[in-house]
Amino acid sequence: MTNIRKTHPLMKIVNSSFIDLPAPSNISSWWNFGSLLGICLITQILTGLFLAMHYTSDTVTAFSSVTHICRDVNYGWLIRYLHANGASMFFICLFLHVGRGLYYGSYMYLETWNIGVLLLFAVMATAFMGYVLPWGQMSFWGATVITNLLSAIPYIGTNLVEWIWGGFSVDKATLTRFFAFHFILPFIVAALAGVHLLFLHETGSNNPSGLNSDTDKIPFHPYYTIKDILGALIMISMLSSLVLFSPDMLGDPDNYTPANPLNTPPHIKPEWYFLFAYAILRSIPNKLGGVLALVLSILILMIIPLLHTAKQRSMMFRPMSQCLFWILVADLLTLTWIGGQPVEYPFVVIGQLASVIYFLIILFIMPITSMIENQLLKW
């Protein structure tokens, strides 16, 4: 008799995705981040749901309701900090996941890659709107500054900004709609993640060598289920340590001051995971130019498959490309640091240099280096 997991309509889907899925035998721990992102998303949805039970999206009571959650709700402080630091964990996993894709040439699976970039945009939008909800100083001014960027769009800009605000400034209407969007977007992210997996399972996973692995496949369960569980335990222990020992390490002290439209904080900056893009935005003196650079800094991921000139898929056997990849990582870390610094010399110049290097490496240096490597390997 055939096993129920292979015949039952619902079990069949689970079976072909997580149990009998043929996986390459040599995928390393860099392939763990997909499952870790799934765990992050589930954690965020659950903690967010419990927070939403006690939160009020009104300018008068929003800040107080978050304080109430931390002080009066059973384990409210734990739920709130799990949610806030869970977002940081989410982005750490996201950046590592994208970095893995770039290093090993996983972007050659076009549909999977492009949906992944859409997912990145959706998660960034969700995180931005979530940061506005506690209605602290940085929430209010962050929302004001970032939404105001849309006014750089010619002709319709100002109308668009006021339409998003629901008035002539960031106020009650803005907070209410941001809460609504922040609630719905994670479910859209979950649906997109399902499509992401669907397309991935059409082709099967890539592997570190970048070579076809059809001749050497192993079942996902038990080999990679146990490996994913280990990864999950490590991530959960890291998140728990962060939440229980230094929950405010990644936050901004300004956000413990209630929002005040009459008092601008000295340094307006987003959460750490947006600082690299914020630094690129600030490095261009023109408003529209800065906004375009900001959007392109992420959108550029979509054209990476078109810039692949190497005859090999992975960077595993391409030392020159490897060096460039790590220079790009260092450049992004530099941008992240600059994004958190005040707008003054020498930070402005460093930011401009790092921004130029970021686009140069991706658009020109990487493809040219790959072509040189082809010549050196006589391919």
From Swiss-Prot:
It comes from the Eukaryota. Component of the ubiquinol-cytochrome c reductase complex (complex III or cytochrome b-c1 complex) that is part of the mitochondrial respiratory chain. The b-c1 complex mediates electron transfer from ubiquinol to cytochrome c. Contributes to the generation of a proton gradient across the mitochondrial membrane that is then used for ATP synthesis. It comes from Crocidura caspica. The chain crosses the membrane at residues 33-53, 77-98, 113-133, 178-198, 226-246, 288-308, 320-340, 347-367. PANTHER family: CYTOCHROME B (PTHR19271:SF16). A ubiquinone binds at residue 201. GO terms for molecular function: metal ion binding; ubiquinol-cytochrome-c reductase activity. Signal peptide: none annotated. One of its GO terms (biological process) is mitochondrial electron transport, ubiquinol to cytochrome c. Binds 2 heme b groups non-covalently. Heme b b566 binds at residues 97, 196. InterPro entries: Cyt_b/b6_C (IPR005798), Cyt_b/b6_C_sf (IPR036150), Cyt_b/b6_N (IPR005797), Cytb/b6-like_sf (IPR027387), Cytochrome_b (IPR030689), Cytochrome_b_C_euk/bac (IPR048260), Cytochrome_b_N_euk/bac (IPR048259), Di-haem_cyt_TM (IPR016174). This is Cytochrome b.
